[in-house]
A protein has these predicted regions:
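S-adenosyl-L-methionine/SAH cofactor-binding core of RNA-modifying enzymes
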Residues: 1-45, 51, 88
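Solvent-exposed alpha-helices and their adjacent loops that cap or buttress functional pockets
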Residues: 32-35, 61, 119
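SAM-dependent methyltransferases
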Residues: 115-177
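Alpha-helical scaffold segments in soluble metabolic enzymes
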Residues: 5, 78, 82, 137
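Internal, active-site/partner-interface "lid" segment
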Residues: 74, 86-126
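Structured adenosyl-cofactor binding patch, chiefly the S-adenosyl-L-methionine
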Residues: 53-100
Length: 177
């Protein structure tokens, strides 16, 4: 009844059931979900929900990972947060979402704050120099380095530019020396 009522109050809603059996949720899926202006997230508890409801009311099944939790509430919160932050005006800086991990198929570059030097080390000089093209190159290289080390599977899926290929060669040389 709740699904039908929600559908009535918002025409053309897209119903997503959160279950480990669904297609895996990722940044690309968050961007796709944003295209649906009205979404109903359906979360089960313990054993899930009645199959007849899934067959008659659900448009797609979505999983947040290869694990099981007690209910779908926390996965629903993850989906809500990932989708909402892509909505124009939600983040203070409109460029923030486009620089996040996974937005371009890579992990995000390292972040540094003030002061320039503290007990944990120094901020890289290139970030303090003010040369925006050098900073952009450093960010790309460090993003590639981090992805290469921590999530090499992402690089296999990405179509690399010539610049990215050259930077990965540099990274491999640096790692081997």
């Amino acid at each position: 009844k709740a699904i039908k009522k929600a559908k009535q109050s918002s025409n053309s809603s897209h119903v997503i059931y959160l279950s480990p059996q669904g297609q895996k949720f990722n940044q690309k899926r968050a961007e796709e979900f944003l295209q649906h202006r009205k979404i109903i997230l359906l979360s089960g508890r313990y054993e899930g929900i009645d199959e007849r409801v899934i067959e008659s009311e659900v448009d797609e099944i979505c999983s947040v990972g290869d694990f099981v939790v007690s209910g779908g509430e926390i996965p629903a919160l993850l989906v809500i947060d990932a989708v909402c932050r892509l909505e124009k005006g939600v983040l203070g800086d409109p460029d923030s979402a486009s620089q996040d991990s996974f937005s371009d198929g890579l992990l995000e570059f390292p972040q540094y704050t003030r002061p320039d030097s503290n007990e944990f080390g120094e901020v890289p000089d290139v970030l303090l120099g003010g040369n925006h093209s050098e900073i952009a190159k450093w960010r790309l290289k460090e993003s590639l380095r981090r992805t290469f080390k921590l999530r090499p599977d992402l690089l296999k899926k990405k179509v690399l530019t010539n610049q990215e290929k050259a930077l990965i060669s540099e990274i491999k040389s640096e790692e081997n020396s």
